[in-house]
Amino acid sequence: RRKENEKGRYTLIFLAAPNDESAEIELTYNWDGDNLGKGSRNFGHLAYRVENIYETCQKLMDNGVVINRPPRDGHMAFVRSPDGISIEILQEGEALAPQEPWLSMENTGTW
């Protein structure tokens, strides 16, 4: 599946294995580049849906991953892979109720 956004100047590409659309990967291509400088690959990020965004982010933090954009809204967070790729984590279904410690966490770096 492909979705063009003229106003936002980006394209979303949704990839899934044949006959298994439940394991979908979203690729974001920014038409004007991503302004990340040298070594940039001109795409925005990878996005994954998870069953519980708070549990997922806690597990990532417990394993040394920096949560660059905490899930303050119970719906969306961002981290970076070891090689600098931005990864969006999305709550499957409705957003969870906002809760601590996420609600008070500041953004770290860029995502």
Indicate residue ranges for each PLM-predicted region.
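Positions that flank functional sites
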Residues: E6-K7, H75, Q99
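Vicinal oxygen chelate
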Residues: N19-S22, Y29-S86, Q91
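A short, acidic/glycine-rich surface segment
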Residues: R1, Y10-T11, N30-G37, A97-P98
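Short low-complexity, flexible loop/linker segments enriched in glycine and/or proline
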Residues: I13-A16, D83-I85, S104
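Core segments of cupin and vicinal oxygen chelate
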Residues: R1-S22
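N-terminal beta-strand motif that seeds the catalytic metal site of vicinal oxygen chelate
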Residues: R2-K3, F43-Y48, L90-W111
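Intrinsic-disorder/low-complexity coil detector
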Residues: A17, R69-P70, A97-E100
